[in-house]
Amino acid sequence: ILTALDMMNDGNDWIVDIDLEKFFDTVNHDKLMTIIGRTIKDGDVISIIRKYLVSGIMIDDEYEDSIVGTPQGGNLSPLLANIMLNELDKEMEKRGLNFVRYADDCIIMVGSEMSANRVMRNISRFIEEKLGLKVNMTKSKVDRPSGLKYLGFGFYFDPRAHQFKAKPHAKSVAKFKKRMKELTCRSWGDSNKIGRAHV
């Protein structure tokens, strides 16, 4: 968040917010293994990773082979996904773009709307053609910082400080309050049950 703020306050106040559609479910096995194979030369390790990827999933109590995606909840899945998206990082660095990424949540910051639209087109094409992933164009957008929600934070311009700042996004706060209320009500209900049981 602090890195994003530094970039915004350096004049990069147009945001390219790219949403990857069902990222963990759509990782292309062949492309991922090609990337891994550039670094790992041990055939046994490659074989183990490949077996992990195709280990299958349970859908409605039925076993199905997995031909794409990484196993949900698997210990290796976040690491393998990050290896895939590291290729995106390298491409954006090569293009000299200002960006921050956490897992599959990535935003790019540029200096003009025209640049933002061009980056949206080019990076979306790279993601789909080179990485074999799907960009959700309905959720992806070009926006200003005030319209952005990233990792639970919203951004606003402070005219007195002459800079962008961040604070917990209103939707994140509302979600947190709702969750706390649910937990409190549940705890209160359990306490009442225990109290009645002792009477």
Segments predicted by a language model, with ranges:
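Conserved polymerase palm-domain catalytic core
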Residues: L2-K149
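A conserved non-catalytic segment of reverse transcriptases
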Residues: V54, K130-R196
